[in-house]
From Swiss-Prot:
Organism this protein belongs to: Erwinia tasmaniensis (strain DSM 17950 / CFBP 7177 / CIP 109463 / NCPPB 4357 / Et1/99)
Pfam families reported in the protein's UniProt record: Bac_DnaA, Bac_DnaA_C, DnaA_N
PANTHER family from the UniProt entry: CHROMOSOMAL REPLICATION INITIATOR PROTEIN DNAA (PTHR30050:SF2)
Ligand binding (ATP): G171, G173, K174, T175
Gene expressing this chain: dnaA
Any one cellular-component term (Gene Ontology): plasma membrane
GO biological process, one term: regulation of DNA replication
InterPro entries the record matches: AAA+_ATPase, Chromosome_initiator_DnaA, Chromosome_initiator_DnaA-like, Chromosome_initiator_DnaA_CS, DnaA_C, DnaA_dom, DnaA_N_dom, DnaA_N_sf
Protein name (record): Chromosomal replication initiator protein DnaA
Region spans: Domain II: 83-126
UniProt xrefs under NCBIfam families: DnaA (TIGR00362)
Keyword Lipid metabolism carried by entry: no
Amino acid sequence: MSLTLWQQCLARLQDELPATEFSMWIRPLQAELNDNTLALYAPNRFVLDWVRDKYLNNINALLNEFCGANVPLLRFEVGSKPVAQAISQPVMVSAHASAPGVVSRPAPTRPSWDNVPALAELSYRSNVNTKHNFDNFVEGKSNQLARAAARQVADNPGGAYNPLFLYGGTGLGKTHLLHAVGNGIMARKPNAKVVYMHSERFVQDMVKALQNNAIEEFKRYYRSVDALLIDDIQFFANKERSQEEFFHTFNALLEGNQQIILTSDRYPKEINGVEDRLKSRFGWGLTVAIEPPELETRVAILMKKADENDIRLPGEVAFFIAKRLRSNVRELEGALNRVIANANFTGRAITIDFVREALRDLLALQEKLVTIDNIQKTVAEYYKIKVADLLSKRRSRSVARPRQMAMAMAKELTNHSLPEIGDAFGGRDHTTVLHACRKIEQLREESHDIKEDFSNLIRTLSS
């Protein structure tokens, strides 16, 4: 009975929730029905609190639907059910998996991550930046899932999300999260061997090992770490020997229950020049996108950065900067640094007029690059239609969806009002523009393809 009940709940929740959310929060749960009490076991307190806060109503509604008058009492616990009595085992799937199923991957060869002794004879270069942690990472809708996944990995390395693959454009916080995970793991286990590096460093180390006839030492070094954090994995493209060695390193680490975290500027399957067998393995754990920050997050980033520098930044000034610079966090912080430097040099107060002057060239370039005309041309080219189609009255999906996307882009990337955007799209009403923006926002939550289109277009228009 309990097996059928929880499987029914899983099937419905997978239909109702975005794939990433289902894989990250629901799949790891184990269930047991005993004495009219349904116990759900979460791998750690973080998952338990998140599920109870975000999905309790969904689960209760399904229990009421499936059980009628005999609804069991729902109880949450941290831990796992003893194997002999376990009802549903957690299944590790990619965030983009379309159906439940066991992922084909090697079983860990060591039972507990915590019980592995440190290898004192090897000298490790951690390279983890202690300045980057979860506390100073500004969370928003665009990066919420990525931060949550990274936090879980830091709390439970070598667990359900192995490997963790983070992808998104430049300057969105992927590297910050890598370092935050590294710091989190080492805070929990000070003697952990955590190694952070750019993918090019892996290539350089391998080349040096080949030159010095030290390839066995190279293998031993990388295969004995507790956690390997590699940035910009796309730079492995077309480096066949490096890919071959990383393939075997990857397998060895997973078999040893050692944590792997990778970042890239694109979704794993879209990385050109990387072998399919590697791209397949990249998706064995959890794949999460980081998108450009929305307005509220950009404002929060500016305010936090100013606070770290003991600078009083008026809210209207932060909003002014955030509304005009939209591409990534790095650009925002660079602009704020310039404003702060100018204020220190001149002794002037930071006002909107002062920011206009300090960032004159940057703002002028941004306004020149991102216009509604430019957006229309870029979107039309991306979807292989004509600009005239976007302005027409045609309602076919092949035209209507790109038109909605272009309107959403115009609202996101320009300072034009909704009526002005509507006028630029064939004299449409502002309510049509508002509907388009809300529709695209909804589809970004439901469709991986729409989310990718949005991110690709933002990246193109903001570069």
